[in-house]
A protein has these predicted regions:
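Conserved beta-strand in the GNAT
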Residues: 36-38
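General beta-strand recognition
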Residues: 22, 49-51, 142
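A short mixed-secondary-structure module that forms the rim of ligand-binding clefts
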Residues: 40-79
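A short, Trp-centered hydrophobic/proline-enriched beta-strand micro-motif
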Residues: 13-30, 70-74
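N-terminal leader/targeting segments and the immediate start of mature chains
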Residues: 1-18
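Structural detector for hydrophobic anchor residues on beta-strands
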Residues: 19, 48, 84-86
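Charged, gly/pro-rich active-site loop segments
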Residues: 2-3, 81-160
Length: 160
């Protein structure tokens, strides 16, 4: 098993190159639900944290109340893949929401974007009640480059 310090930079690099991922949660009956979202990952050399600016919809709230976990699966046409299985929690404090809003705005495209300019009703700023922030704390990571898949190499994995 690989150490977090070895896999996290490779995961962040690949996730940020692919940008969009399928995020899956489960409902109270154990059925999966997926949606395509746009996390931004921060690696400080010790901790890896993912952030998603999103809406706190009734479905997302119910799923995370039932099971506070999410799976983030990235795929590129080259068959590069990476996966983060995470504890997921809502973050409501305005200071953190403001920091992440500005981070998304200041990060170069295609990873960065202006959350207030994408047309979601009510997304006028980080203090807006319709803007929610989801924090992801991985407990499992997996990275596999397409070229390694073709050569029969196994994925690099980490688990907390």
């Amino acid at each position: 098993m690989t150490e977090l310090g070895e896999i996290a930079p490779a995961f962040v690099d690949l996730a940020h190159r692919i940008v969009w991922c399928t995020v899956s949660t489960t409902d109270p009956a154990g059925r999966p639900r997926s949606r395509v979202l746009h996390p931004l990952w921060e690696w400080d050399g010790q901790d890896l944290t993912g952030w998603i600016v999103t809406s706190k919809t009734p479905i997302k709230q119910a799923h995370l109340a039932h099971s506070p976990y999410a799976s983030c699966n990235y795929w590129a046409p080259t068959h590069d893949t990476c996966l983060a299985e995470c504890a997921a929690e809502w973050v409501d404090d305005v200071a953190t929401k403001t920091r992440l809003w500005e981070l998304f705005k200041s990060t170069p495209a295609p990873l960065g974007y202006d959350p207030g300019a994408i047309g979601v009703p009510g997304w006028t700023g980080p203090e807006s009640p319709s803007v929610s922030l989801l924090r992801l704390r991985p407990w499992r990571l997996r990275v596999l480059l397409g070229e390694n898949l073709q050569n029969g190499f196994k994925a690099t994995s980490w688990r907390a």
